[in-house]
Amino acid sequence: MNSGNLFFGWADESSQNKGRYRAIGMVSHPAEFESKLEGDINNILDYVFDESGLKRRELKWNKIDIFRCRAYERIVDYFLEHTGLGNPPFRVDILRWDIEDSRHSIQGRDDNQNLQRMYYHLFSNVISKRWPSGDWCFFPDKTGSVDWGELASFLDLGGSKVDLNERFNIRSINEVDSKDNVLVQVADFFAGLSVFSKEKLGLYVDWKFEKRGQQRLVPVEKIDLSKKDRRRFKILSYFEEGCEKLKIGVVLDRSKGLWTPNPANSINFWHYEPQSDADKAPTR
């Protein structure tokens, strides 16, 4: 182990093997910040429980309800406020991709190997460029699409394998149960928010017009919106307005969804763009 810096990364995936847009979210921080960060998030959930009387439960973006909606607002406050103060002791990085772009819209695409390649891009961006050198412990959700135990610290990129220990100083990989780990739940939230911001952007714009009392050619009440999507719109709006108010540097781009122009920002939404005509997803 490196005798200097030690970092932790907590990751979860959104919309794997379904839907057009997919994402990985990762919360990373120096190891010594783990207890404070976990404690602060748990305190937020306890506060929401005490304030509302609603049953505390695992945060899951795909099962959003009133408790989760209120908890997400407080979590947004926490991460935006710390980011707004400058140099926060954490990062939140979200990589999203489109399976209908020129890279992914190919016959025989291997989604598992492609996901591993996206993890490689995420590690390259976060570990290699955003933190000082050091050792890493990686904690992915055990219900994710990658069998980390079977990989034995090697990412299969299709035609080549990458030793995570050698390439990124990832010394250990421990799959965790998201229901017992709030930082994986936070990673799930931001990954889900990223996918939703792109997938539902048109409907979100319609919803915002209606909230302002303005009319569109197709009134939003005539569009079939689920109760869950309305709650998600509320959270997306809360996040967007918070970023604008605190000048966080995250924007809701009309073509990219949530996007961070400067990837050095501690909250970094990134949409993968094919690098060239030759950039293709691996095939089976």
UniProtKB/Swiss-Prot annotation:
- Record InterPro entries: DUF3800
Instruction: Name the keywords, alphabetized.
Output: Plasmid
What superkingdom does the record give? Archaea
Q: What is this protein's record name?
A: Uncharacterized protein ORF2
Taxonomic source organism: Methanothermobacter thermautotrophicus
